[in-house]
């Protein structure tokens, strides 16, 4: 019944699965299996076998599935809704259905009766993320409060269940404050440069480009200067500038900013093109990015975790650039958290570090991206091809990729269910702060203690102390010939042994990590 009946009766196969299945049984129960909730209702709850009956049930008892409704409204005869409205001009579910029809199709219904009754919210804020109350818009035509968080071109849904509510309640600033209490604000600020560089390096590592040192430094500079600054970086001018700074001059791109060519995510295996994801057509991108901005404007004051997830994952699924989408996607997480005051300047959370260094986390990240791409590509089988001839597009990109399924995919691209992405990002942020950043803070504290202890044994500049610490690590505590020649005083009786003991004591309670690799990374900055 409800959404499941509508899908079956009208032959609709949505890409985003129905997360709530309603059925009739002997008693009222709720069952949850593999993330799918099955609601069992008694016979008296069965709707009439009509569009009106089951659509009312869906809007009343289930979290509205906008992708399903978008596909449904293009299949039905509009007269079915118009007659419903004529019969119930003040009915709350008839009014909601009429508004959503026009919102999702862009078509206007012929209304024969005056719509009356009190103003009602279009979506139930207890079931879905909706616009903040002050950003809801009264609609006089339908006598509803438009509290959809986005636009017809981009209006993702985030379902409110136990896991997503917990994720959205994650207090990032409190987690960072806990670190500050343990290690002190000064130490956290001293680690900022390292964490920014680490985020940059790891962001390239995710894309298989970990050794691009000049590009890593350039992206680190972008993170430092641009995070949380100015207006949302989602229009042509801002994206063009951001992309050019990230990519630099050594690129084959002839034009920066929003692409004017088709794009897909894929690989070549044994001379065969494998397509993992197809992005929206270039003609749709501007309006979709405006939808992301609208979402951010209309959800002001709500969960920073939720808002950063929608901005970042919305961006990656829109894929508005010809190159650099992944780095901007991860940049947006820190950018929105900074704008929402969840992370204070100049701190950058090294989220990419955890993804790139932990194979299980990398698998989770890839899997969360596949939540949309895999079922979408299954639905688009046979609708794309690689032609023998190439086309040169307005942005200079040459491509022989041709996609024939824009109309099929728009329902999904525009109405993504990003609930799991929000849950994942909360998990990633919590691990980054509680584990990755804490480990880094422990290291910095131990390193400072080692420096201080060595200075009490023999005076030397910090740069030499750092070489000594690296040498102790790489040579298992033995004094190397090179270091003994560079710093002869280390050859004096007991000095080297005292230094080794001081370093061991400083790092005894710290993290088990490779000092050599840490310093190798730091010395490149």
Task: Tell what function each PLM region has.
Residues 1-322, 327-525:
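FIC/Doc superfamily catalytic core
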């Amino acid at each position: 019944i409800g959404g499941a009946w509508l899908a079956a009766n009208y032959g609709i196969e949505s890409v985003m699965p129905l997360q709530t299945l309603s059925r009739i049984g002997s008693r009222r129960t709720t069952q949850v299996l593999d993330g799918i909730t099955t609601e069992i209702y008694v016979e008296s709850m069965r709707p009439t076998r009509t569009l009106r009956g089951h659509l009312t049930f869906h809007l009343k008892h289930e979290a509205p599935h906008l992708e399903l409704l978008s596909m449904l409204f293009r299949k039905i005869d509009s007269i079915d809704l118009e007659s419903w409205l004529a019969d119930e001009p003040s009915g709350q579910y008839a009014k909601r259905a009429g508004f959503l029809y026009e919102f999702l199709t862009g078509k206007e219904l012929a209304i024969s009766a005056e719509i009356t009754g009190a103003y009602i919210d279009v979506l139930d804020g207890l079931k879905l993320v909706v616009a903040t109350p002050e950003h809801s818009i009264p609609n006089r035509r339908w006598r509803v409060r438009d509290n959809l968080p986005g636009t017809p071109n981009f209006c993702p849904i985030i379902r409110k269940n136990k896991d997503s509510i917990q994720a959205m309640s994650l207090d990032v600033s409190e987690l960072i404050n806990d670190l500050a209490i343990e290690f002190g604000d000064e130490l956290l600020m001293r680690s900022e440069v390292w964490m920014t560089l680490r985020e940059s390096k790891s962001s390239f590592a995710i894309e298989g480009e970990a050794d691009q040192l000049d590009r890593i430094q350039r992206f680190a500079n972008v993170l430092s200067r641009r995070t949380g600054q100015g207006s949302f970086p989602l229009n042509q001018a801002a994206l063009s500038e951001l992309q050019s700074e990230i990519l630099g001059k050594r690129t084959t791109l002839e034009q920066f900013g929003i692409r004017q060519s088709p794009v897909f995510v894929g690989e070549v295996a044994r001379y065969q093109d494998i397509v993992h994801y197809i992005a929206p057509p270039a003609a749709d991108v501007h309006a979709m990015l405006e939808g992301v901005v609208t979402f951010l404007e209309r959800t002001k004051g709500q969960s920073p975790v939720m808002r950063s997830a929608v901005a970042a994952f919305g961006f990656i699924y829109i894929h508005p650039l010809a190159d650099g989408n992944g780095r901007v996607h991860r940049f947006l997480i820190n950018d929105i958290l900074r704008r929402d005051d969840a992370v204070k300047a100049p701190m950058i959370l090294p989220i990419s570090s955890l993804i790139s260094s932990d194979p299980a986390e990398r698998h989770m990240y890839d899997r969360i991206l596949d939540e949309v791409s895999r079922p979408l590509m299954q639905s688009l089988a046979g609708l794309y091809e690689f032609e023998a001839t190439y086309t040169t597009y307005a942005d200079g990109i040459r491509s022989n990729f041709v996609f024939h399924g824009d109309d099929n995919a728009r329902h999904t691209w525009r109405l993504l269910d990003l609930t799991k992405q929000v849950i994942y990002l909360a998990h990633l942020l919590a691990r980054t702060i509680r584990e990755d950043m804490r480990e880094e803070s422990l290291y910095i504290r131990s390193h400072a203690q080692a420096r201080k202890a060595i200075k009490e044994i023999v005076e030397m500049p910090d740069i030499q102390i750092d070489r000594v610490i690296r040498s102790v690590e790489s040579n298992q505590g033995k004094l190397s010939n090179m270091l003994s020649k560079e710093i002869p005083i280390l050859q004096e009786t007991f000095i080297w042994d005292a230094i080794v003991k001081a370093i061991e004591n400083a790092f005894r309670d710290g993290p088990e990590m490779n000092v050599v690799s840490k310093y190798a990374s730091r010395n490149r900055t």
